[in-house]
Amino acid sequence: MLTLPDLLLPPELAEINALMDAAEYDDGRASARGIAAGVKSNRQISRRWPKVARLDEILEAALRRCRPFREVLSPSAYTPALFARYFPGDAYGPHVDAVMGGNPPIRQDISMTVFLAPPETYQGGELCLHHQASPTQTIKLPAGHAFAYPTNCVHEVLPIQSGERRVAVVWIQSFFRDPDIREMVADLRRCVESAKSTPNTDPLPISKVLNNLERKFIGT
């Protein structure tokens, strides 16, 4: 799991929200499958709406410049975002996201929620992750922050009591399907950068380990 503070700059966040004010929306259940469709209640921007391309451009630019996104998650591909609004009474009950998504389809290893509304402007709407061996984790971040978590985790969005929850959701295929390998690669990348900035330290040995680990396990 990874928190990305200030993924979106204030001007980007303002433009996204202005576009969302004017957008065309579909019933959110149209993008859900199986059990998820029966527990989902929200509105999502239609991919047929012409200006959705501008929303994609803004988020794409933010992801491209975000170093932790690249170095920790090792994305090989990711889906276009779903931009969603939740009003009072809306929720998304416990579910697991689909294995494949996007067009063309990609394997969905990591789910990422980008928060677009200040948390003080709505009550409820927390993202809850249900872990088998640890307590439920509740996430409600400032606008512009993002949170990435394993797609195979049971999670839900609690009912909105007042105000409006706005989010963008992206699904990511990682070069490293195994989350343990992905974490080791990210740790070694940090070690290499630390060695580069430490006087009288040779980064080559650990860089060699990193390169060989990537070579052995990298995939799509």
Kindly give the residue locations of the regions a language model identified:
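Catalytic core of non-heme Fe(II) oxygenases with the double-stranded beta-helix
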Residues: R67-A186
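Non-heme Fe(II)/2-oxoglutarate
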Residues: M1-P75, I181-T220
